[in-house]
């Protein structure tokens, strides 16, 4: 029952948040030229797509596959994270030389510790050990759960073939990773573990002392992150480890928060050459992520697009002797994403109003709506309400109704039909009178 309840809550949260505008509204190129093959940035407070570059382009998922393993774990076992399991020997060969957290077979771990290993070190053994244990050794069954849940979340370009990302058949895209991360962010345990710059793994059967797992997300650590560090970074994961002597592309999926505004950043297939920080371990996707993070938080803020205390429009009023017009006010200030250096006046307002309103009117009555656009994209629709009571003048109302009746189609039809009937009746009477005046012929009979 708890699993079902957790699943329902998670999907309610997800569906309430995923109504997105048609396209991205902003371009970072004046500040930074994105080199990734694809990217997707969304403000989760407003669901506004801030930046979109080939976001549906399918790419290799690599280590990001662990996000789907975590999604299955948290959907079904969120209340059992402190339960223990033994790292199975059966997965040893599969993860050989990729066991980034040194979690050895037959050692005992909690599922929460496995989460820390996955999210700090991208540990393949943690993902495979969790999947093997919870699926009762049926890894294909676990992968089937991953694909089923992925589709329920809304992904369209993702395919999962193992629990950790070693297999090259794991594919995804920037939009899909946004959906998956946003789903995961609905779990408190995920948010807490993702934000840890390090984790102390307790001593185990084959480890006499505890060990410290330092997060590969260098942006989380002020002490060791160097130029990558950003206080706004809340958590994230890379598809591959940092480059040193080799080359390639890298993807990073993360989220940041500053001054109450939250954004998800999905940067896919950044070339290693784009990292110009100069460290021996190059992190190109994280480099581009923090550059885009700087651009977003420096350029935009959540502001009120409308002032509910100011008149936004006027509309003619009929049947009132007190006023000819009615002042309209927005029913909501509509907090939205706007350039930091401007205010709500940068939006374009498109009013949807009747030609006039008729008294009586009560303050607060909804009269119409205003559609707000920014850079050609609709950012919201707000109701417009009456700013004051307007009483009806009975005389004006009566006179207008008489005029309305006298000019109505109904009266015109009645008059025309009456005229036609009168003409027909007149013709009939004329014919009848004519027939009466005509002399009758006498009939003579022979005898």
Name each model-derived stretch.
Residues 1-8:
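Positively charged n-region of N-terminal signal peptides that target proteins for export
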Residues 9, 145-146, 288, 292:
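Generic structural signal for hydrophobic residues
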Residues 14-23:
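C-terminal segment of classical bacterial N-terminal signal peptides
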Residues 15, 125, 299-303:
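Short secondary-structure junctions and interdomain/linker hinges
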Residues 15, 74, 131-132, 428, ...:
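Membrane-water interface at transmembrane helix exits
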Residues 22-175, 179-188, 193:
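Active-site-adjacent loops and short helices of periplasmic peptidoglycan-processing enzymes
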Residues 155-156, 168-176, 181-446:
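Domain-terminus/edge residues, biased toward the C-terminal soluble/receptor-binding domains
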């Amino acid at each position: 029952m708890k699993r079902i309840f957790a699943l329902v809550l998670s999907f309610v949260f997800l569906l309430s948040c995923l109504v997105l505008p048609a396209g991205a509204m902003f371009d970072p190129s004046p500040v930074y030229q994105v080199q990734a093959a694809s990217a997707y940035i969304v403000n989760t407070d407003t669901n506004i797509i801030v930046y979109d570059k080939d976001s549906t382009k399918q790419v290799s998922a690599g280590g990001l596959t662990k996000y789907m393993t975590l999604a299955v774990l948290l959907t079904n076992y969120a209340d059992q994270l402190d339960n223990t399991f033994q790292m199975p020997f059966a997965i040893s060969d599969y993860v050989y030389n990729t066991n980034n957290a040194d979690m050895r077979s037959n050692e005992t771990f909690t599922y929460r510790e496995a989460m820390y290993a996955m999210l700090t070190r991208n540990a393949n053994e943690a993902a495979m050990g969790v999947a093997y244990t919870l699926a009762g050794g049926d890894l294909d069954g676990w992968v089937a759960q991953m694909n089923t849940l992925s589709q329920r979340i809304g992904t369209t370009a993702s395919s999962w073939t193992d629990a950790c990302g070693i297999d090259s058949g794991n594919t995804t895209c920037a939009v899909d990773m946004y959906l998956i991360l946003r789903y995961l962010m609905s779990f408190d345990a995920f948010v807490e573990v993702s934000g840890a710059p390090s984790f102390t793994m307790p001593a185990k059967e084959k480890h006499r002392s505890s060990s410290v797992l330092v997060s590969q997300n260098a942006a989380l650590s002020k002490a060791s992150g160097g130029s990558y560090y950003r206080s706004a970074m809340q958590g994230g994961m890379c598809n591959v480890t940092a480059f040193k002597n080799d080359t390639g592309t890298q993807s990073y999926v993360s989220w940041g928060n500053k001054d109450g505004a939250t954004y998800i950043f999905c940067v896919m297939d950044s070339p290693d050459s784009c990292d110009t920080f100069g460290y021996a371990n190059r992190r190109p996707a994280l480099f581009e992520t923090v550059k885009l993070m700087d651009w977003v938080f420096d350029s935009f803020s959540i502001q009120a697009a409308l002032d509910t205390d100011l008149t936004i429009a006027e509309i003619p009023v009929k049947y009132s002797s007190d006023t000819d017009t009615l002042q309209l006010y927005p029913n909501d200030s509509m907090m939205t994403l706007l350039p930091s250096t401007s205010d709500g006046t940068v939006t374009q307002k498109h009013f949807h109003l009747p030609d006039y309103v008729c008294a009586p009117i009560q303050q607060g009555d909804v009269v119409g709506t205003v559609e707000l656009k920014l850079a050609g994209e609709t950012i919201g629709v707000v109701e417009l309400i009456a700013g004051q009571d307007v009483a009806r003048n009975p005389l004006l109302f009566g006179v207008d109704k008489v005029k309305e009746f006298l000019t109505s189609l109904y009266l015109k039809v009645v008059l025309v039909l009456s005229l036609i009937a009168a003409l027909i009746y007149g013709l009939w009477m004329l014919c009848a009178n004519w027939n009466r005046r005509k002399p009758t012929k006498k009939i003579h009979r022979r005898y």
